[in-house]
Regions:
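Membrane-anchoring hydrophobic helices of lipid-metabolizing enzymes
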Residues: 1-89, 99-101, 110, 128
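Non-catalytic C-terminal accessory region of glycerolipid acyltransferases
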Residues: 2, 12, 145-278
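Catalytic core of membrane glycerolipid acyltransferases/transacylases, capturing the structured
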Residues: 41-43, 86-140
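Structural motif corresponding to alpha-helix initiation and N-cap regions
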Residues: 57, 142-145
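Short, conserved catalytic or adaptor-binding loops enriched in Gly and charged residues
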Residues: 61-65, 124-125, 233-236
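Short, flexible loop segments at the rims of nucleotide/cofactor-binding pockets, characterized by
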Residues: 63-69, 134-140, 172-173
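Short gly/ser/thr-rich secondary-structure transition/capping motifs
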Residues: 67-74, 140-142, 224-226
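Conserved beta-strand termini and adjacent loop/short-helix elements that scaffold enzyme active sites
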Residues: 74-76, 116-118, 134-135, 245-247
């Protein structure tokens, strides 16, 4: 039983110690307990425990069910060919539920899906079968670098948030941060077509105010991300919209534009998908 709980549980203290043993030793107990409450550790572990018989795509679907979260999907053109190999790219407005919905929906239409994620999410062990970890704050481990490359060379469908972090309030509008060009480079290298998507939704005003304050104070650590689990639980009973645009052939990503220029063009197509559905 203890072994099973270890597999299922998210443990903030263990995560901190895994990333920085020195920090874990220096943090007062009341700070660790505060972080546990802030990220809803007990509620997350209850969700995982209640669904202990599921993992990967099935678990994502069960979590959405338990949170009473629904979604509608709108296509603007042709649907991806079930026999194709794709990189599905999307804006990242929520920081949690948007990923769960993409895993559930794309995973229900394709046999094998992989999601490129922050390596911290690997601590959610039951979702690890669909996660491919990247280190956003340092060098990637050699085995993770190999897994990253092997994933693009495989037949699995790939889910990707090119911004890396969830959306922020920019010039009064909720919008993604700069998209990184990696997905364009990997699409060309691995001969994968790209499917642009737009996901509706936003976080609370407090989340964006804290992000703005943190930036004004010159704090580099994205402390607002600690609020993302709370943002997820706040959205119980919510419904979202996912807009899916026409697949973009990798053969069309020619030298007339740089990879970064293609990245920005595809970002525009992603945001435009919400206005072009049939």
């Amino acid at each position: 039983m203890d072994s099973e709980n270890t597999i299922l549980s998210v443990d903030v203290e263990k995560v901190i110690r895994g990333k920085s043993p020195r920090l874990a030793d220096r943090l007062p107990r009341f700070v660790i307990n505060f972080i546990k409450r802030l990220i809803h550790q007990d509620e997350i572990n209850r969700l995982l425990s209640d669904n202990r018989d599921y993992n990967g795509v099935e678990l994502a679907t069960r979590i959405l069910h338990d949170l009473d979260v629904t979604y509608n999907v709108h296509y603007s053109g042709s649907r991806p060919d079930p026999s194709g190999r794709y990189i599905f790219v999307s804006n990242h407005p929520l920081g949690g539920l948007d990923g769960m919905i993409l895993i559930s929906y794309i995973g229900s239409h394709f046999k094998d899906v992989r999601f490129i994620v922050n390596d911290l999410l690997m601590y959610i062990r039951p979702l690890a079968p669909v996660f491919v970890p990247v280190n956003k704050y340092g060098k990637m481990r050699h085995d993770n670098t190999r897994l990253f490359q092997d994933t693009f060379n495989s037949d699995a469908q790939i889910l990707y948030f090119p911004a890396g972090l969830c959306s922020r309030l920019i010039d009064g509008k909720v919008s993604d941060l700069d998209w990184k060009k990696t997905f364009v480079t990997k699409a060309i290298e691995s001969r994968r077509d790209i499917v642009p998507m737009f996901f509706s939704g936003e976080n609370s005003g407090f989340f964006y105010r804290l992000a703005g304050l943190r930036k004004k104070l010159g704090i580099k650590v994205n402390i607002e991300t600690f609020l993302l689990p709370d943002e997820m639980f706040r959205k119980k009973g919510s419904s979202f919209d996912l807009y899916i645009g026409d697949p973009i052939p990798y053969t069309s990503l020619t030298g007339e534009h740089s990879h970064k220029e293609w990245c920005d063009i595809i970002r525009q197509k992603s945001y435009a998908a919400r206005n072009q559905t049939r």
